[in-house]
């Protein structure tokens, strides 16, 4: 991974988030989290967690996420609000923190391996 290539960095962050959230929702496939079937509310929630980690925790601008993920600003804002509200419950907050920590550790492994090469 070229640490100066914003596209590669974004993709590495997204991949780390998808894998971490997949581990948090083990009954879902990554493809179902990336593009949730319309009637799958758990897949939609998992996707919202991914967007929340990307924006709130990894610091990607909402505008960039909207463009790259081909989502509307309203969909991204709704995802952020939904997860912010769910974070008020301790059980969900603990689960979210575990997924966030896993995403960070996965991203650290990717960047460490790249720098070592």
Task: Enumerate the predicted regions with their spans.
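Short alpha-helical "recognition helix" segments of helix-turn-helix
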Residues: 63-72
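Helix-turn-helix DNA-binding helix
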Residues: 75-77
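Short Lys/Arg-enriched helix C-cap and helix-to-coil transition segments
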Residues: 86-106
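Short, amphipathic alpha-helical "recognition" segments used to contact nucleic acids or chromatin
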Residues: 43-60
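Short, Lys/Arg-enriched anionic-surface-contact patches
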Residues: 23-47
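DNA major-groove recognition helix of helix-turn-helix
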Residues: 55, 79-80, 84-87
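General nucleic-acid-binding
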Residues: 1-21, 103, 112-117
């Amino acid at each position: 991974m070229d640490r100066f290539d914003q596209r590669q960095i974004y993709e590495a962050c997204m991949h780390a988030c998808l894998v971490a959230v997949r581990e948090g929702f083990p009954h879902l496939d990554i493809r179902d989290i990336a593009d949730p079937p319309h009637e799958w509310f758990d897949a939609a929630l998992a996707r919202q967690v991914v967007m929340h980690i990307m924006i709130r925790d990894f610091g990607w601008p909402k505008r960039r996420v909207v463009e790259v993920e081909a989502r509307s600003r309203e969909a991204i804002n709704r995802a952020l609000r939904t997860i912010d509200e769910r974070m008020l419950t301790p059980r969900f907050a603990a689960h979210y923190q575990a997924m966030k920590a896993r995403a960070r550790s996965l991203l650290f492994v990717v960047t460490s391996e790249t720098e070592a090469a």
